[in-house]
């Protein structure tokens, strides 16, 4: 499990919504947590694979804007480069919104850990509002009383942890430069 003390190490209050984090990254095998070490190390390893071997395989269409992926549909970008981008989208979002990569973006309750099926169905996609009754949706349709938003555990803040953030983004910079120059520069900047 994870613990979070009173200090969040970021500009947000405990349980306050942190915008911009629902992008990129990978879930752990067996649950739907997004762990820092998994995302950082996977992104770094994929970047090194690209810069060392340049595998040109392109069998997956990935559209980050619409969050759509389709296998066996080439899109002109090598799959490994798209995977590097998928990692940096998550890393950069955390660095820009929190200041560093959190220990984990995890499930809010034990019920979610035995969930089977598509991760999309873990949440209603609305911001949690404790003033609403469970499953009640606000009139504007943007908030609900369902406490299904992920928790961001930001107690990981350390010099050693931030070094891994830097190393992963630095490794991604040359891998992304040709196909995703904006994300490449964003990684270098962060």
What are these regions (language model features)?
Residues 43-46:
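HEAT-repeat alpha-solenoid elements in large eukaryotic scaffold proteins
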